């Protein structure tokens, strides 16, 4: 069973075993508008929790995507590099950014669950 957690910077992480899939939330892609460019890290790169993991550019702004957890990049979503609009179309699914081999599962405890994140987003509106 996978478990999904959220940051206050609107990144999500879905964990399945020791693999963490990371992307941006629907709220984030709505705020960005039409995504026109995505820059992803190289496979094999070690990323610490809170470090820049990717860059996403939209018609409105460029924004860094920070990793919610630490680990080694084991896969990147080349589909969204080729077709960045995939982030807008399915941010929480096929629009994922990177997959990491999770270094420290306890980092997940610092992140919000879905209910807490929903409350957080409501507080912003």
Swiss-Prot record:
Its cofactor is (R)-lipoate. InterPro entries: 2-oxoA_DH_lipoyl-BS, Biotin_lipoyl, GCV_H, GCV_H/Fam206, GCV_H_sub, Single_hybrid_motif. Keywords: Lipoyl. Pfam families: GCV_H (PF01597). GO terms for cellular component: cytosol; glycine cleavage complex. CDD domains: GCS_H. The keyword Repressor does not apply. The glycine cleavage system catalyzes the degradation of glycine. The H protein shuttles the methylamine group of glycine from the P protein to the T protein. The glycine cleavage system is composed of four proteins: P, T, L and H. This is Glycine cleavage system H protein. It comes from Parvibaculum lavamentivorans (strain DS-1 / DSM 13023 / NCIMB 13966). The lineage of its organism: Bacteria, Pseudomonadati, Pseudomonadota, Alphaproteobacteria, Hyphomicrobiales.
